[in-house]
Amino acid sequence: MSTEHKAKAVHFNVDTALSVTTHSRPLRKKSQIPTFSSPRAYAIAMPFDEMLARAKKENPDVQKLIDERGLRQEIAAVNLMVAKLCDKACEIWPNAFMVLVDERYFRAPLQCIGLADNTHRINRTLPTADELQQIRDRLDINGAEFKLGWYRDMYPDQHI
């Protein structure tokens, strides 16, 4: 017995061959994430004073708690407000996350709403301009103080 196998040519009927041909798909241009030497997050800056004012407006008891407990309560109120806004942003952009960015861009470390990062594979896509505008409108953050950009991420492993 021979263990040698010979390849056989396969021929299709002309009608079958035409139905098997693949059709080209439209090419979608993907947004490219720039290369950085350190962990960065594409985020919308949420200014501390603005977030504190929103927290006080949403819940008048916040001011009383701040008077009793001081700066720690202010920080907690701002973090809670940013978390709520992040949840709203997730309705439009599911990859949204809270991120703490480096103080070299602001006068203190700042909580931001992250939309993409250069550290995690699942967060490497960027929202479209239309999605960004929807997020800004939904969160009412259209002012110049809500800057969008690539910021140094202080704790990249905490927002997976």
Regions found by a protein language model. Give the residues of each.
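Short, intrinsically disordered low-complexity segments
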Residues: 71-125
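Acidic, proline/glycine-rich low-complexity IDRs
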Residues: 125-160
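Short, flexible coil/linker elements and helix-boundary hinge sites characteristic
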Residues: 59-60, 69-70, 86-94, 124, ...
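A short linear-motif detector with a strong N-terminal bias
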Residues: 18-23, 79, 125-132
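Short, extreme N-terminal segment that most often corresponds to the first beta-strand
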Residues: 1-75, 148-160
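Intrinsically disordered, low-complexity boundary segments flanking structured domains
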Residues: 22-30, 99-101, 133-138
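Charge-rich, solvent-exposed alpha-helical interaction surfaces
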Residues: 51-54, 65, 77, 81-88, ...
